[in-house]
């Protein structure tokens, strides 16, 4: 299981190239290197194995920047979800699909889990806005992803390869 990310809130028109490069290096290049080295090792096992990349619901949909707006701050100065977050997370989906076909002859499966957010003390007004965009009307609890992840890694999902599985309370269904 592999996941890497950096948080840098900055508006697109002011987003520094060095932060772009840093975020891509951590989130995408880091994942590529882990997959390259550990995936190769898995491919040498006679029984193969499973790789699960952790993407995000924001790897399959654009972030709703209105969620991050704060009253009293001009629109052009509002914090936003950084451009690199969705770029990295959608890039992980591409990497997952590539690896799913690359080592499939060696019984290496590669899938991606795309979790939504976790409720962890965010402000109430933010949670209200997020909940309104999720059919289950809530964010996940911290232990609600492990069942899906364990299944994806287990032999119970032995024919699952190249799948992009959203675990987001239905958010990406809308």
Language model regions located:
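A conserved structural motif in NAD(P)-dependent oxidoreductases
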Residues: 134-145, 156
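Conserved mid-core segment of classical short-chain dehydrogenase/reductases
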Residues: 1-21, 63-79, 84, 122-128
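Catalytic Tyr-X3-Lys loop
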Residues: 6-32, 52, 85-87, 92, ...
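Short, small/polar-rich loop/turn modules that mediate ligand/substrate recognition or access, typified
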Residues: 104-109, 160-162
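Short C-terminal tail/terminal secondary-structure segment
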Residues: 9, 70-73, 150, 161-174
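Amphipathic alpha-helical dimer-interface segment in Rossmann-like NAD(P)H-dependent oxidoreductases
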Residues: 26-46, 58-62, 100-101, 105, ...
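Conserved SDR Rossmann-fold cofactor-binding beta-strand/turn motif
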Residues: 109-119, 153, 166-168
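Conserved internal alpha-helix within the Rossmann fold of NAD(P)-dependent oxidoreductases
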Residues: 30-35, 50, 60, 92, ...
């Amino acid at each position: 299981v592999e996941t890497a990310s950096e948080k840098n809130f900055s508006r697109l028109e002011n987003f520094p190239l060095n932060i772009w490069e840093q975020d891509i290096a951590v989130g995408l290049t880091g994942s590529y290197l882990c997959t390259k080295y550990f995936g190769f090792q898995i491919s040498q096992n006679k029984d193969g194995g499973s790789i699960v990349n952790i993407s995000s619901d924001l790897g399959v949909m654009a972030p709703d920047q209105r969620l991050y707006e704060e009253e009293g701050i001009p629109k052009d100065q509002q914090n936003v979800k950084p451009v690199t977050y969705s770029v990295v997370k959608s890039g992980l989906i591409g990497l997952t699909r590539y690896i799913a076909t690359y080592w499939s002859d060696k019984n290496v499966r590669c899938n991606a889990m795309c979790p939504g957010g976790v409720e962890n003390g965010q402000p109430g007004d933010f949670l209200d806005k997020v909940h309104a965009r999720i059919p289950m009307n809530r964010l996940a609890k911290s232990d609600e992803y492990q069942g899906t992840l364990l299944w994806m890694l287990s032999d119970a999902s032995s024919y699952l390869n190249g799948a992009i599985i959203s675990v987001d309370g239905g958010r990406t269904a809308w």
